């Protein structure tokens, strides 16, 4: 079995179309996400009501593809799709965090905001995530944490203007 696995890995690695196979693997999950999106009349605030696990799978598969095949001719297309997926996932996390704020589940809201800040740092929703943290800490009456979150938010805003 071990020699079979080694040979299989060598064949996969040496195949001239391996990059395409990995790219298509990422697109398969992306296609599922596009189908879900096209079935909704207007995306609007509906993101939080949908399961975006296929978007996350696609994002991870495309990340692996780019890591393994940085010189592939499909990299730019993969990056474009990842940008769309990243923003879709971040938007959902913001909507869920806002839902938690309304439900007074402040720790859960902070957790969702932290996910965006840590895992999707280049998304356009980072500022909103930081604002949610400030609001949640304020509502929990956690003065020190609120001050820290405000400082980070202010640094982020200043850095964004540069």
Model-identified regions with their sequence ranges:
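Short solvent-exposed coil/turn linkers within tandem alpha-helical repeat scaffolds
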Residues: 13-20, 34-36, 49-52, 65-80, ...
């Amino acid at each position: 079995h071990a020699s079979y696995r080694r040979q299989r890995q060598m064949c996969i690695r040496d195949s001239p179309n391996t990059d395409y196979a990995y790219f298509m693997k990422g697109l398969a999950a992306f296609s599922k996400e596009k189908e879900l999106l096209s079935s909704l009349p207007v995306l609007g605030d509906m993101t939080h009501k949908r399961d975006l696990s296929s978007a996350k799978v696609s994002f991870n598969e495309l990340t692996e593809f780019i890591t393994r095949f940085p010189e592939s001719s499909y990299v730019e297309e993969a990056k474009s799709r990842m940008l769309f997926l990243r923003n879709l996932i971040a938007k959902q996390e913001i909507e869920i965090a806002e839902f938690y704020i309304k439900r007074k589940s402040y720790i859960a809201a902070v957790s969702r905001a932290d996910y965006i800040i840590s895992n999707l740092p280049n998304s356009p929703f980072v500022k909103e995530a930081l604002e949610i943290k400030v609001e949640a800490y304020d509502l929990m009456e956690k003065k020190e944490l609120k001050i820290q979150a405000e400082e980070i938010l202010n640094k982020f805003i200043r850095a964004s203007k540069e």
